[in-house]
Amino acid sequence: EMIFKVLFKVDCRINTEAVSISPKNKTVDLKNVETGEQTTESYDKLVLSPGAPSIKPPLPGIDLPGVFSVRTVPDARKIREWLEKGTGFLAGMNRYSGFQTVRPKTRAVIVGGGFIGIEVAENLVHRGFDVQLIQRGDQVLTPLDREMARVVEGFLGDHGVKVNLNDEAVGFKKLETGALEVQTKSGQTYPADVVILGIGVRPDTKLAAAAGLKVGKLGGILVDAQMKTSDPDIFAVGDAIEVKHYVTGEQSLIALAGPANRQGRIAADVIAGKDSKFRGTQGTAIIGLFGAAAAWTGVSEKNLNQMGEKDYEKVFLYPNSHAGYYPGASPIAIKIIFRKSDGKLLGAQALGKDG
């Protein structure tokens, strides 16, 4: 707070919720979540950046202790505190305490095979956990095409993550032992000491919609190229907005840090009088997993088939990460998708341990 105030002259108010906006009066009603005190602030220009909270479906037992969603740093801290309650210096061993046996927490179930699910799975493996990952679809990392995702799934399996595809969690139960049980649509059950939900995010548009701002078909706040909403004095940036996909030209929800950073800078430029515009995003992303990486940009072959696009071709390449006459080179699997009629690059995906 002090850094923002001293260096940037920004009045940063933590523990404060914006509860409503009045575009007509150009005011925002605020509430201190600790004291309940309510205040009103006026604005000339307003920027909304509410983000996209984790999806938490109304499943039986989803609010049980030990079942977590993870999206923010405080979320991660809560999970770490929960894990450390039952580990201690005797992790991996049972110990007798009073009239009960205290068993370290060593079993984890991850629900969801996207960014968050895979990164949490890796970290729990490093902590010595037995990890089960449940994915509703037929592959992890849905932006990848299936043949590329299969490589990722094999790599996860090689490092101890048990990947369960085409299944989904339908409920959670606390057992007499104190452990949790994850119940799935297939009828399979998984015992767990901790359950992490990583089943996606949804744009937070409640405040914007209540203020009468337009929301798109995909559920995000609609903005123009200068990040202005349907009210020219209210801007919106980040995971809560719909943006143009640079390759397809269609509206998309792209919850990535890179585009959000650029959108914030463009909104600031426009407010300051500079004619800046957001050209769209390619959805470029990368994820590390057990010393390797998976990356993608543009559209996948799967996307093109869903769009009914036939004018494309693909090529697979397997170069080394560096010149073969230097030691330590490892192969990189690359898939490139391009338009046949003019050779325009439409998308690319890459997997490898180096390079």
Feature names for model-found ranges:
Residues 240-354:
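Mid-to-C-terminal Rossmann-like scaffold of FAD/NAD(P)H-dependent oxidoreductases
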Residues 28, 33, 46, 193-196, ...:
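AMP-binding/adenylate-forming core of the ANL superfamily
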